[in-house]
């Protein structure tokens, strides 16, 4: 045991001796050399004012220059601190620019009949309105009366019609668009037809979108303001109906104007045109660009699986679809994705409660950067101004009644005239921008260095080199002192 301790002491002394010999090979400068080093730095540095302190023999002038330098450094530190504090508040500015163009892209227009289902089909399935409210709940949260959900009629229908396809029912018995319902269609002076519309499902059942997607880019531009899309629709009030209590009591068409790259969103955004009216819609194109966090609230890294372009509405639909598919094992047909379609029993027992759970727990939120669906980094909107006039006039009523082989009363109660035009051939860009970028911050800091101290990046490197050299000398000095102390306090080695 004693032999082991002696070996350890000998090894430690040997190691300490090697370190001491290594450090001793780096001779420390003498006090005279260190003073000369400090003097040379003061005389050669590009930090203005220091050489005036070093070379002045007059003590008063030396003190004045010392006060000037310290004051300048204090102001410099204060200015740089304020710049950094301002930068890390992530300030932004908003720029608005109006771009005039020769041709401007025309938006997509999605329209639906406020009377959603055929009267004959509704008479056979009187509960269809309530069932559709349950199904369309995936698009908009709505209160479903507890009395209705638990009514014997509802439970009996859901239990005995598990193979009932709400999708097929709506598609076959909802509003349709053909040459009878689309009486006249004109886009920029050219005739259009039902083939130019794409069928989509919304909370209004069967809807139809003009200029949807990216497959008609050669068709969706107009070059003259005041000309655009003209539609004359027949809503067939006698053929289609709706329940005035949970449904709609109006007769006419609801439509929404949106980007061709995005799905229609009606909730709170739809425009209505009643029968017997001519709706003149004047639109403008407004593009908005948001900054990513921390300057703004958008997240450019979020991509949607089922949509080409990100939108908050599309993101919310995908979010709901993920939760429902995971917890219910099926997918509502109004939501995007691939999966087994939910039947009525699954809608009733699983989908509807899960939607309430998602809302209560905030599982699909929108708006801020840390929400499920933050705001879009880029979005295009079409603010609209709508004016109405009675349609048709008495003379036009007689003309249309003869042309369509209908009574004048039918013409007044079923026709809807919609006209959508651009007000001007321009679009407005509202862009959120960084108030201070990194290059601007560096330029500002550099300007403060030059203003108060006549310094630059090279000056900072000079100062760093000066302090590093002094730190190196002090470090070696203290290490040598520590080694000497350890060796002196070590017990003498036995012979």
Curated annotation (Swiss-Prot):
Residues 83-459 are extracellular. It is a multi-pass membrane protein. One of its GO terms (biological process) is neuronal action potential. InterPro entries: ENaC. It catalyses: Na(+)(in) = Na(+)(out); Li(+)(in) = Li(+)(out); K(+)(in) = K(+)(out); H(+)(in) = H(+)(out). Expressed by cholangiocytes (at protein level). Detected in cerebellum, brainstem, kidney, liver, hepatocytes, lung, intestine and embryo. In the cerebellum, restricted to interneurons in the granular layer, specifically in GRM1-expressing unipolar brush cells of the vestibulocerebellum. A motif (GAS motif) lies at residues 454-456. GO terms for molecular function: bile acid-gated sodium channel activity; ligand-gated sodium channel activity; proton channel activity; sodium channel activity. Inhibited by the diuretic drug amiloride. Contrary to its rat ortholog it is not inhibited by Ca(2+). Gene3D superfamilies: Acid-sensing ion channels like domains, YojJ-like. Disruption phenotype: Knockout mice lacking Asic5 have impaired motor coordination which is associated with altered electrical activity of type II unipolar brush cells of the vestibulocerebellum. Residues 1-30 are annotated as: Binds the plasma membrane and stabilizes the channel in the closed state. Forms bile acid-gated sodium channels and may play a role in bile acid-dependent absorption and secretion by epithelial cells of the bile ducts. Displays high selectivity for sodium ions but can also permit the permeation of other cations. The gating could be indirect and the consequence of alterations of the membrane environment of the channel by bile acids. As a sodium channel of type II unipolar brush cells of the vestibulocerebellum, controlling the electrical activity of these cells, could play a role in motor coordination and balance. Forms homotrimeric channels. This is Bile acid-sensitive ion channel.
């Amino acid at each position: 045991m004693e032999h082991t301790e002696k070996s350890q002491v000998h090894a430690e002394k040997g190691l300490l001796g090697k370190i001491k010999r290594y450090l001793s090979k780096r001779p420390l400068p003498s006090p005279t050399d260190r003073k000369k080093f400090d003097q040379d730095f003061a005389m050669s540095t590009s930090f203005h004012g220091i050489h005036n302190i070093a070379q002045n023999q007059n003590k008063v002038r030396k003190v004045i220059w010392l006060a000037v330098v310290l004051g300048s450094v204090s102001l410099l530190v204060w200015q740089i601190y304020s710049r950094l504090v301002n930068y890390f508040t992530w300030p932004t500015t908003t720029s608005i620019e109006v771009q005039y163009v020769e041709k401007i892209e025309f938006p997509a227009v999605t329209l639906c009949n406020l009377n959603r289902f055929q009267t004959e089909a509704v008479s056979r399935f009187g509960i269809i309105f309530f069932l559709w409210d349950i199904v369309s709940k995936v698009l908009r949260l709505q209160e479903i009366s507890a009395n209705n959900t638990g009514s014997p009629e509802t439970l009996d229908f859901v239990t005995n019609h598990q193979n009932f396809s709400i999708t097929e029912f709506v598609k076959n018995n909802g509003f349709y668009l053909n040459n009878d319902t689309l009486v006249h269609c004109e886009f920029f002076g050219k005739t259009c037809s039902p083939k130019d519309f794409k069928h989509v499902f919304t909370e209004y059942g069967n809807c139809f979108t003009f200029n949807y997607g990216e497959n008609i880019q050669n068709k969706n531009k107009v070059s003259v303001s005041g000309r655009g899309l003209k539609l004359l629709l027949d809503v067939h009030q006698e053929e289609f109906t709706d329940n005035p209590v949970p449904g709609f009591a109006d007769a006419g068409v609801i439509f929404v104007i949106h980007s061709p790259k995005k799905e229609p969103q009606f909730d709170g955004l739809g425009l209505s045109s009643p029968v017997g009216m001519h709706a003149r819609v004047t639109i403008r194109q407004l593009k908005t660009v948001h900054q990513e966090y921390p300057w703004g609230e958008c997240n450019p890294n979020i991509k949607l699986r089922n949509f080409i372009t990100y939108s908050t509405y599309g993101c919310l639909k995908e979010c709901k679809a993920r939760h429902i598919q995971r917890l219910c094992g099926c997918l509502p047909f109004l939501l995007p994705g691939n999966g087994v379609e939910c039947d009525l029993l699954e809608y009733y027992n699983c989908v509807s409660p899960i939607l309430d759970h998602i809302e209560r727990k905030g599982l699909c939120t929108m708006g801020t950067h840390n929400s499920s669906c933050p705001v879009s980094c880029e979005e295009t909107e079409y603010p609209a101004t709508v004016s109405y006039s009675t349609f048709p006039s008495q003379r036009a009523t007689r003309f249309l009644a003869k042309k369509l082989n209908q009574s004048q009363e039918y013409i007044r109660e079923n026709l809807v005239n919609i006209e959508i035009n651009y007000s001007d051939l321009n679009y407005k860009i509202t862009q959120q921008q960084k108030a201070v970028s990194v290059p601007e911050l560096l330029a500002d800091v550099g300007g403060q260095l030059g203003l108060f101290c006549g310094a630059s990046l090279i000056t900072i490197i000079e100062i760093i080199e000066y302090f590093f050299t002094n730190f190196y000398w002090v470090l070696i000095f203290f290490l040598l002192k520590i080694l000497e102390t350890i060796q002196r306090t070590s017990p003498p080695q036995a012979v």
